[in-house]
Amino acid sequence: MSFSACQTCECCRRGHPAHCHSFDRINFESTGENSVFWEEGSTRSAEPDIFGQFFGQSSFASWTIVQEDAVVNVSGLVEGREELQLLAPLGCGIQTGAGAVLNAAGAQAEDTVVVLGLGGVGLSAVMGARIAGCKTIIGVARNEARLELAMALGATHVVRIDSADVRVVTEGVRAVTHGRGADVTLETTGVPELVAGGIRMTANKGRIVQLGTAPETAVLNLPIHEFMVAGKQYMGVVEGDVVPREFVPKMIEWVKAGRLPLHKIVGFYPAEDFEAAIRDMKSGRTIKPVLLW
């Protein structure tokens, strides 16, 4: 499962459903009239009416009600429950990171890619950059274990954040790139200071891709003239700007071919061990917990 979109707005019609004008309302709000199976006059206590609405991923349910377009039919691509449970996270964080590199940024083999933050989205971006054949892939994080995992997943270099001064990270990236900076910078943390640092460590004509969610009140200050002269591009990207029914099957093929080593970041937990899954995710022991019923 993945996200839903209205299918009628300009973004949807142009093949960008992740930027649907009604994305939040359709995926994260349940106001009755936008719920699946909702009928005028029905109530929560009315039987046998069942209705609901929520994003297809991360619903913590063995059964869930979703819009039809949130479902990706993998019949013929997936064999058995064991394979299906490994692939379960593809429809959100994995496609966000990998899709941002391969689809939104259009990274090429000659590009240098920097990934700020190495959670599920960031590590998926690292794997996506490796699939693209990017010559230099730099992972940036605080956690040493995450940096080691990034190297195992395809990063060519890592920079550890061991200071509150973001300039240290910028200098580290510029040292790896011989002063030039990155062609593609993927910011997955949403930390305003790192966002600003990401822009500085990006090369002229480079792309800065914002994937991490910042506080709603956060503001980014840009030196307008410098930004214009450098020809940099700053773009916000949701869900990798992909069409799930097209991109998820591609990811499945990459997993099977060993190009997207999903097993290195996914961990499985019985549903009754939900709290343990949360603890392991917060501690970094497991990157992508999957609940099993």
Please name every model-derived segment.
Residues R44-F60, V78-N103, L116-S124:
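A glycine-rich, Thr/Ser-enriched phosphate-binding loop motif common to dinucleotide/cofactor-binding enzymes
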Residues D111, G206-R207, K232:
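Glycine-centered, small-residue-biased loops immediately flanking beta-strands
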Residues T112-L118, R130-G197:
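Adenosine-nucleotide cofactor-binding segment
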Residues T202-N204:
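Helix-to-beta-strand junctions that scaffold the AdoMet/dcAdoMet cofactor pocket
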